[in-house]
């Protein structure tokens, strides 16, 4: 036998190298076969419910790192709730209708207009479901625990029927109406868009300053006067029917030198406009308030058959332009509102593909709207005063990345204005985890217009509206419920397979159809109405979930998207918000803080991370950043996270190895019988348990990460485990001192493994497989530990916190001695302490081997004068010398009692007593040399 074999060196086959890319799929397969998710739900039956409702990602393409961050975050929350006494099933979902899938099929050569509608929709459906299957595997590979066999998908018959019923309730309450209001129109998608489908980019546009000649000045202005207007959309001049001024804005009538014409502009803008138009010696002839100009008639710049009326509008400002806005009610929301209020004609001169129509005039017809500025300038002639190229923020179609226009077309709307206050009141009742999120959603609802819910596309849920022979829309409770039942049985494709009459209840009649003939709506619903109905299609309809949901968690872009549409439909139907709490996340940026894009080549695919590091590292990264804001990710950042993971893993490996001969049933020591330092570590660990439990409760992942890493690196590795080796390795295997420390080790190991499970389920499960005395076969089926309180813990903490301050000073003294070559490592030191009365009392009260705690070979507490050479601190001073004696071959301490023993071992008296007591045969025969 060798001397080394008398040490209690930890034994474990738990590997230092995690091998996550290979091991994770093995664990996931085992969990699936063992039905761990289902067993967790069964265990929690009858407990309080917690419903985190999954916002559905769009079923197209592989998941990106933003998807991964979001789904991992949800998984951490749901797992922590499941392990905290809540019944928390998680139903993943997918959004499956909409233009992107139509675009994919178009790129594959599918020509929608040449196919039967039902055949085309089947192709869309098949593609969408293939993407659901692909993404499901992507999410499962992240270790997300969910009801993967029973997800919700917005194209299933039950979901479509639930969506129709949401629409039906809104129709019954009078919230659905048809109008020809201007809407965001995407010529590239040939469809109306909702606000959530708009993104803003900088765009360079041609802006024109031109003048309308006064035709009837109403006794205020002469007919040789011209009203100057500004436009950034020259094509809309073809549909201009009025000029809008601000009632309280001051306008001036001016005559520049050398001009026969007089002009009206806003007084505040005269100087800048004079410079722009090269006007000199401008004479101000008169001033007017805007309301004095109301109802003056001007000529259209080139269309002699059109008059343009001066009207008042609150949207007019003097921030830019001329203080007068040309008004085309067919091409803008403000224009429409003031135009209709003043009886202006609503004219639309651009078709669905962005092409100018015949009513724009022969010079414009057939041309693309964005290419007609030169023609407009030519038509204006000397009415054109200036032209500028301006860069401004402009709305784009978020899918095609092309600019959009406002365009008035017949559309179906949800009247948000009718119940806006009810929505705002509900927002006040929601718990937001960021105050700015509440303000953002509140302001969006407060300021938004009515919701255009119709789309001129194919792949989506039909609007369940019929028309009588006289074109009266029909959407009664009876007809809508009948359609819902048909969709429930056959899916929404039946809308396209049957005639209108066959979709109506048998024997249905309507006074507007004396001949019994009916037609049906060809538009589909906005996809935001699809996902915005999920609270009904899923949360209400699934018995295992509770409505309203406890939590919605998505990216911050969903304030204008899913958070918004879900809120509107839920309040419209039931008068309540669909969520009790709202939590939003920022975007994942690259390592430099730049937005990720394929064109820049700076994207990170979750699959690449899984292959190089493992999903655990991606999961740990999610907790290491503040996801409420934009976060950075790169392979370098993930390498740093991987290093944190390695420290966590190896610390827990040390605990596994050094409790391999510990049976908690027979070997554990009661708290009151632990040494003071072991009690201190137990209390500190329970403080960690409380902090982590609180952080899980408040979804504060970063707090968990920081608390955990700090405890492992500072409290455990740098302190407790550092000196623990002198006990667990050196002392007799069954000694009280060793069992005391093992009790603390085992307690920390078991509980920290449970605390880690929501974040690192694969690693936690691997550790759990080495804990033979724990009852649950999977750690996921256990409960998170509760923090314990102990008698006199405050006094104990105060004492040991004071010691930790003292220890820091001692370490500085040892470091100085190292720098001066007095010692090499601390175990070579004899540390002499010169304490004041308070520190002396502290050290004596610890009742612990101070040399062991400070990892020195010898320690003296001295009285009397402090030597000049001492390292001085407030309340204590130190001197450091090399310890006397020889190095013990067993404990490595320098000890005066170290000598060669008769059994071939050069060891100290303490080690000799352990060997002679526990290894009698070796003492008789001698150690191998």
Curated annotation (Swiss-Prot):
Residue numbers covered by motif 'HIGH' region: 57-67
Residues the entry annotates as binding Zn(2+): 888, 891, 908, 911
InterPro entries for this protein: aa-tRNA-synth_I_CS, aa-tRNA-synth_Ia, Anticodon_Ile_BEm, Ile-tRNA-ligase, Ile-tRNA-ligase_type1, Ile-tRNA_ligase, M/V/L/I-tRNA-synth_anticd-bd, Rossmann-like_a/b/a_fold
Cofactor: Zn(2+)
Keywords on record: Aminoacyl-tRNA synthetase, ATP-binding, Cytoplasm, Ligase, Metal-binding, Nucleotide-binding, Protein biosynthesis, Zinc
A Pfam family hit: tRNA-synt_1
Entries under Gene3D superfamilies matching the protein: 1.10.730.20, HUPs (3.40.50.620), Ile-tRNA synthetase CP2 domain-like (1.10.10.830)
GO terms of biological process kind: isoleucyl-tRNA aminoacylation
Catalytic activity: tRNA(Ile) + L-isoleucine + ATP = L-isoleucyl-tRNA(Ile) + AMP + diphosphate
Motif ('KMSKS' region): 595-599
Note describing how the cofactor binds: Binds 1 zinc ion per subunit.
EC number: 6.1.1.5
Domain of life: Bacteria
Keyword rRNA-binding attached: no
Residues binding L-isoleucyl-5'-AMP, per UniProt: 554
Compartments where located: Cytoplasm
Single Gene Ontology MF annotation: ATP binding
Enzyme class: ligase
Domains: entry comment: IleRS has two distinct active sites: one for aminoacylation and one for editing. The misactivated valine is translocated from the active site to the editing site, which sterically excludes the correctly activated isoleucine. The single editing site contains two valyl binding pockets, one specific for each substrate (Val-AMP or Val-tRNA(Ile)).
Quaternary structure (record): Monomer.
Role summary: Catalyzes the attachment of isoleucine to tRNA(Ile). As IleRS can inadvertently accommodate and process structurally similar amino acids such as valine, to avoid such errors it has two additional distinct tRNA(Ile)-dependent editing activities. One activity is designated as 'pretransfer' editing and involves the hydrolysis of activated Val-AMP. The other activity is designated 'posttransfer' editing and involves deacylation of mischarged Val-tRNA(Ile).
HAMAP family associated with the record: Ile_tRNA_synth_type1
Annotated PANTHER family: ISOLEUCINE--TRNA LIGASE, MITOCHONDRIAL (PTHR42765:SF1), SOLEUCYL-TRNA SYNTHETASE (PTHR42765)
Family as reported in the entry's similarity comment: Belongs to the class-I aminoacyl-tRNA synthetase family. IleS type 1 subfamily.
Protein name, as recorded: Isoleucine--tRNA ligase
Organism: Streptococcus thermophilus (strain ATCC BAA-250 / LMG 18311)
Gene name as annotated: ileS
């Amino acid at each position: 036998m060798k001397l080394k074999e008398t040490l209690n060196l930890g034994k474990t086959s738990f590997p230092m190298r995690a091998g996550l890319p290979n091991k994770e799929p093995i664990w996931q397969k085992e969990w699936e076969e063992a039905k761990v998710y289902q067993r967790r739900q069964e265990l929690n039956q009858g407990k309080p419910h917690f419903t985190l409702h999954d916002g559905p990602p769009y079923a197209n393409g592989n998941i990106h790192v933003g998807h991964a961050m979001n789904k991992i975050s949800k998984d951490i929350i749901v797992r922590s709730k499941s392990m905290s006494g809540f019944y928390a099933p998680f139903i993943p979902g997918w959004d499956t209708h909409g233009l992107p899938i139509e675009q994919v099929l178009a790129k594959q050569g599918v020509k929608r207009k040449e196919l039967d509608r039902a055949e085309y929709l089947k192709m869309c459906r098949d593609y969408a479901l293939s993407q659901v299957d692909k993404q499901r595997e992507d999410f499962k590979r992240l270790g997300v625990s969910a009801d993967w066999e029973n997800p919700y998908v917005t194209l299933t018959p039950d979901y479509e029927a639930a969506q129709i019923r949401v629409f039906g309730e809104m129709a019954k309450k009078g919230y659905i109406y048809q109008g020809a209001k201007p809407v965001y129109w995407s010529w590239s998608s040939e469809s109306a868009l909702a606000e959530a489908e708009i993104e803003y980019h900088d765009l360079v546009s041609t802006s024109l300053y031109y003048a309308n000649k006064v035709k009837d000045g109403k006794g205020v202005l002469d007919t040789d006067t011209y009203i100057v207007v500004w436009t950034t959309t020259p094509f809309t001049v073809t549909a201009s029917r009025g000029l809008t001024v601000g009632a309280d804005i001051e306008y001036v009538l001016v005559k520049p030198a050398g001009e026969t014409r007089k002009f009206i502009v806003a007084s505040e803008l005269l100087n800048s406009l004079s410079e722009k138009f090269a006007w000199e010696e401008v004479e101000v002839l008169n001033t007017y308030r805007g309301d004095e100009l109301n109802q003056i008639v001007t000529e259209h710049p080139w269309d002699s058959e059109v008059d343009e009326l001066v009207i008042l509008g609150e949207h007019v400002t003097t921030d830019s332009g001329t203080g007068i806005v040309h008004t085309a009610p067919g091409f803008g929301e403000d224009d429409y509102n003031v135009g209709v209020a003043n009886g202006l004609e609503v004219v639309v001169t651009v078709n669905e593909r962005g092409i100018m129509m015949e009513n724009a005039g022969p010079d414009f017809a057939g041309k693309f709207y964005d290419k007609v500025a030169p023609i407009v300038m030519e038509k204006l002639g000397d009415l054109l005063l200036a032209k500028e190229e301006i860069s401004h923020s402009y709305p784009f179609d978020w899918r095609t990345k092309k600019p959009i226009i406002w365009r008035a077309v017949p559309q179906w709307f949800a009247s948000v204005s009718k119940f806006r206050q009810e929505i705002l009141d509900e927002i006040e009742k929601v718990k937001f985890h960021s105050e700015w999120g509440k303000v953002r959603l509140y302001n969006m609802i407060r300021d938004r217009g009515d919701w255009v819910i119709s789309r001129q596309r194919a792949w989506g849920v039909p609007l369940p509206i019929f028309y009588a022979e006289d074109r009266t829309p029909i959407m009664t409770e009876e007809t809508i419920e009948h359609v819902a039942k048909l969709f429930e049985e056959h899916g929404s494709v039946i809308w396209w397979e049957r005639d209108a009459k066959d979709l109506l209840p048998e024997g249905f009649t309507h006074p507007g159809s004396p001949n019994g003939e009916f037609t049906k709506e060809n538009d589909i619903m906005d996809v935001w109405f699809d996902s915005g109905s999920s609270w009904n299609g899923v949360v209400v309809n699934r018995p295992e979930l509770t409505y309203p949901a406890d939590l919605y968690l998505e990216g911050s872009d969903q304030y204008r998207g899913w958070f918004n549409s879900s809120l509107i439909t839920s309040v419209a139907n039931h008068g309540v918000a669909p969520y009790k709490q709202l939590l939003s996340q920022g975007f994942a940026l690259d390592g430099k803080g730049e937005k990720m894009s394929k064109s820049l080549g700076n994207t990170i695919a979750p699959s690449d991370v899984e292959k190089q590091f493992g999903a655990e590292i991606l999961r740990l990264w999610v907790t290491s950043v503040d996801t409420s804001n934009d976060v950075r990710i790169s392979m370098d950042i993930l390498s740093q996270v991987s290093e944190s993971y390695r420290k966590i893993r190896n610390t827990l490996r040390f605990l596994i190895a050094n409790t391999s001969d510990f049976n908690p049933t027979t070997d554990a020591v009661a708290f009151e019988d632990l040494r003071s330092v072991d009690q201190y570590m137990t209390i500190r660990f329970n403080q960690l348990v409380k902090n982590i439990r609180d952080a899980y409760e408040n979804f504060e992942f970063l707090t968990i990460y920081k608390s955990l890493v700090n405890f492992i690196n500072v409290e455990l590795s740098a302190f407790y485990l550092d000196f623990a080796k002198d006990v667990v390795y050196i002392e007799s295997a069954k000694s009280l001192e060793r069992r005391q420390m093992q009790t603390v080790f085992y307690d920390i190991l078991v509980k920290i493994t449970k605390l880690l499970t929501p974040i690192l389920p694969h690693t936690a499960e691997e550790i759990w497989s080495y804990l033979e005395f724990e009852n649950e076969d999977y750690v996921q089926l256990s409960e998170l530990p509760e923090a314990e309180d102990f008698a006199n813990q405050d006094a104990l903490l105060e004492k040991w916190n004071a010691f930790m301050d003292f220890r820091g000073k001692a370490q500085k003294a040892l470091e100085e001695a190292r720098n001066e070559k007095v010692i090499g490592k601390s175990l070579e030191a004899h540390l002499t302490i010169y304490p004041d009365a308070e520190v002396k009392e502290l050290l004596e009260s610890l009742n612990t081997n101070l040399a062991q705690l400070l990892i020195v070979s010898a320690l003296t507490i001295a009285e009397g004068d402090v030597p000049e050479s001492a390292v001085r601190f407030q309340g204590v001073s130190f001197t450091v010398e090399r310890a006397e004696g020889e190095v013990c071959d067993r404990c490595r301490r320098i000890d005066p009692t170290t000598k060669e023993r008769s059994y071939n071992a050069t060891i100290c008296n303490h080690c000799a007593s352990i060997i002679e007591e526990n290894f009698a045969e070796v003492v008789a025969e001698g150690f191998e040399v």
